[in-house]
Amino acid sequence: DFIQTNTKADIVDINMGCPVNKVVKNEAGAKWLKDPDKIYHIVKEVTSVLDIPLTVKMRTGWSDSDLAVENALAAESAGVSALAMHGRTREQMYTGHCDHETLARVAKAITKIPFIGNGDVRSVQDAKLMIEELGVDAVMVGRAAMNNPYIFTQINHFFETGEELPELPFDKKLDIAEDHLKRLVDL
């Protein structure tokens, strides 16, 4: 109720994927991935008091991906509006590679809500692979946007036209960075 009364939020997102120790030691973030029932009850409780959409981001699991589908289905059946999954376990943190096989299994299992694939989306081709081969409904770009904030334009352009945009010239990248800095200062 606080969120809807005191903010202008259009959506609430629960991050069940945060792998850092200071979060998981407090029984939060990726720690919840060990217990699909807990995921269900948390999502059910939050959706019962919200009039705006609730989304969840999670990882494929804690130390393995055995519960990935079960965790995703728990969130879906509890009423989440969309689910994003990072294709690494908590144990992996940010190392290794995105587990495409697990994301594809979850994409097949989730049928009532949009499923968003995340992890190693560094290019238009990575986004295309996730959508066309893994079956996700959308992609979430993470750390790759720090090196290439233009990636969102590139991906959108590709899916709208079927054409890849050329790499931005360095001076254009500097102009964009300067614009972002000015906007940050204006906040």
Regions found by a protein language model. Name each.
Residues 8, 25-26, 86, 90, ...:
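Short, functionally important structural connectors and interaction interfaces within domains
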Residues 21-39, 88-100, 161-166:
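Glycine-rich tight-turn/loop motif centered on a GG-T
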Residues 41, 49-51, 65-82, 94, ...:
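Alpha/beta catalytic cores of nucleotide-metabolism and tRNA/nucleoside-modifying enzymes
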Residues 11-20, 77-88, 141-145:
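Non-cysteine beta-strand/loop elements that form the S-adenosyl-L-methionine
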Residues 1-69, 73-76:
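Active-site entrance/lid segments in N-terminal catalytic domains of soluble metabolic enzymes
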Residues 11, 15, 27, 59, ...:
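Short glycine/serine/threonine-biased micro-segments
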Residues 17-19, 57-63, 88-90, 120-122, ...:
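Active-site beta-loop-alpha junctions enriched in small/polar residues
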